[in-house]
UniProtKB/Swiss-Prot annotation:
Residues 30-111 form a propeptide. This is Zinc metalloproteinase nas-8. SMART domains: ShKT, ZnMc. The gene is nas-8. Metalloprotease. SUPFAM superfamilies: Metalloproteases ('zincins'), catalytic domain (SSF55486).
Length: 403
């Protein structure tokens, strides 16, 4: 008897499940029919309501962030100067691109602008998510950087959707770095403390768009001289040259004004210049850009064929957090002797604008922190360093390292 009861129960459960399945099918079909007839399911999912569910540590930029970005002050620190100090010896290119450029690999030639289709973002559309670690002002810097691409190119940074397997994750990971072009899957772009300036951000984003550094062009020896005896041996790979078989300059001349050019002291082991321009007056120019050069903009538009591409809509995310604009901190410029007074500044570059360390950094690392006027900067570059590490007391050093 008990056996028959069990059998009857199983039959009842099976029939109930079957009935539920039969009911679900027409509901699913009806919902699918709700899509506009001219819209595929993929493009329909790009609408804000269908943005991919975020992890707890991820978010998007909002309209308020973009409005706050318009209100930012001129907080520029020349990107070419700060980047190589922030990422000392490792450089700011990592991920698959960095592996390919490892001198231990046989394929270690660098490229200026990728030309292989697999490394470009389809239609210039770059899906992203950002870390929720960024404060209001940092989010505004990111928004302002995105908007610069939206205004000057057809590249669009858009919130990641459910169908975007390849995307940027922008977060405070480890200094300032990016992969080059579309690497596939989750692609990290690090903008850590010390990297959240507009010019640094657009530099790293231009890597993700698909460009290497300007001083790595194959023809760079016609325009700059590399002073190998001043370069730290572990940083030699930062001065590789491009592979013409896989790259293109898009018909453009060497660009001393590029946001992608490092400065003349990059990866110096002794404080002396590591590269100088063949046109001597250009040595002070390289690495001093605070925005895209006209050639930077032209090359990006040529890479993505912007005159023909169908621009995807700009979609912003949503958040319940109230955003309050935070004014950019003021920077005091050191007028006279603008030099680093210790050779340890590269270790503490992220403390340059810290509320607690700013005065110490102005005193001992004015050059590295970007507190020089253009005239003082040119004088400092032309002079050997004057390090006096004894000026840093043990307590000051400990405070900077652990405070």
């Amino acid at each position: 008897m008990r056996r028959n009861d069990l059998l009857n129960n199983k039959i009842t459960i099976f029939l109930s499940s079957l009935s539920l399945f039969v009911i679900i099918i027409p509901i699913y079909a009806a919902e699918k029919d709700l899509l506009p007839p001219s819209t595929s399911s993929e493009t329909f999912l790009t609408d804000e309501d269908f943005l991919r569910p975020l992890n707890d540590d991820e978010t998007f930029l909002t309209e308020k962030d973009f409005k706050n970005g318009e209100k930012l002050g001129e907080d520029h620190v020349p990107a070419g100067s700060i980047l190589w100090k922030q990422v000392y010896k490792k450089g700011d290119i990592r991920g698959k691109a960095a592996w390919k450029l490892d001198p231990k690999n046989s394929e270690s030639l660098r490229r200026n602008g990728v030309i292989t289709g697999t490394r470009k973002w389809p239609n210039g559309r770059i899906p992203y998510v950002i870390s929720n670690q960024y404060n209001d002002r940092e989010r505004a810097v990111l928004a302002r950087s995105f908007q610069a691409y939206h205004d000057k190119t057809c590249v669009r940074f858009v919130p990641r959707t459910a169908v975007d397997n390849d995307y940027l994750y922008i977060g405070k990971i480890d200094g300032c770095y990016s992969d080059v072009g579309r690497a596939g899957g989750r692609q990290e772009l690090s903008l850590d403390n010390g990297c959240l300036q507009y010019d640094t951000a657009i530099h790293e984003l231009m890597h993700s768009v698909g460009f290497y550094h300007e001083h790595e062009r194959w023809d760079r020896d016609e325009h700059i001289t590399i002073l190998w005896h001043n370069i730290d041996r572990e940083a030699y790979d930062q001065f590789g040259k491009v592979d013409l078989a896989e790259s293109s300059y898009y018909g453009q001349l060497y660009d001393y004004y590029s946001i992608m050019h490092y400065d003349s002291l990059a990866f110096s082991k002794n404080g002396f210049e590591t590269m100088v321009a063949k046109q001597s007056e250009m040595t002070a120019v390289i690495g001093a850009a605070i925005d895209f050069s006209p050639i930077d903009i032209l090359k990006m538009n040529l890479m993505y064929q912007c005159s023909d591409v169908k621009l995807p809509p700009t979609v912003v995310g949503t958040t319940d957090k109230t955003i309050v604009p935070v004014p950019a901190p003021s920077v005091t410029v050191v007028e006279d002797d603008c030099r680093d007074r210790t050779n340890l500044c590269w270790r503490w570059i992220d403390r340059c604008k810290s509320f607690f360390f700013e005065q110490i950094m102005k005193e001992f690392c004015s050059l590295s922190c970007g507190y020089c006027t253009p005239k003082a900067l040119q004088t400092a570059k032309a002079s050997p360093p004057n390090y006096s590490n004894t000026l840093l007391t043990k307590s000051s050093t400990s405070y900077l390292q652990h405070g």
